[in-house]
A protein has these predicted regions:
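Membrane-embedded alpha-helical bundles that constitute the cytochrome b-like, heme-associated redox core
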Residues: 1-157
């Protein structure tokens, strides 16, 4: 008589690691970094566990500085590059600082967003109850990508 087959799905342990080596490697890497950051900052203040919140904070910095810089920006193809030079030379109070902050906060925002996406994927936080949050995050990633392309095109250099 054949043995009864296991009807319980295997979702964890060594079997899952064998089926998904990339996800297991990514999760091990994120967990290792979590350990180091927990030791340095404590579990509650670990910035590695707060990637989404930090990205959201940077989004608002990018939005505020973008509005400020856009107010002094010439959107025509002929005047765009010269207006960036004028903004950098402090046409308005702190406009050069605002432009630099906008640029570097945008880069950090993209980096933290991608790291947050990878961390959530590695920890399987995209299924069941969290599916809606995952899908809206992926849609927002597309919006961020298109906004970034638009921001680079505005300079016309």
């Amino acid at each position: 008589m054949p043995e009864a087959q296991d009807t319980v799905p295997r979702t964890g342990g060594a079997d899952a690691r064998a089926r998904e080596p990339l996800r297991s490697l990514a999760r091990a890497l994120f967990d290792r970094v979590d350990t180091y950051f927990d030791a340095a900052f404590g579990a509650r203040a670990n910035p590695w566990r707060l990637l989404g919140a930090l990205a959201w904070y940077l989004f608002w910095i990018v939005a505020a500085t973008g509005i400020y810089v856009y107010a002094a920006f010439d959107t025509s193809a002929a005047g765009a590059y010269s207006s960036v030079e004028r903004i950098t030379a402090n046409a308005w109070p702190l406009s050069g600082l605002a432009r630099s902050l906008h640029r570097y906060a945008s880069d950090a925002f993209i980096l933290l967003t991608v790291l947050h996406l990878a961390r959530e994927w590695a920890h399987r936080r995209y299924a069941h109850v969290q599916r809606f949050a995952w899908l809206t995050g992926v849609a927002l990633l597309l919006f961020v990508w298109l906004s970034g392309i638009g921001g680079y095109w505005l300079v016309w250099d």
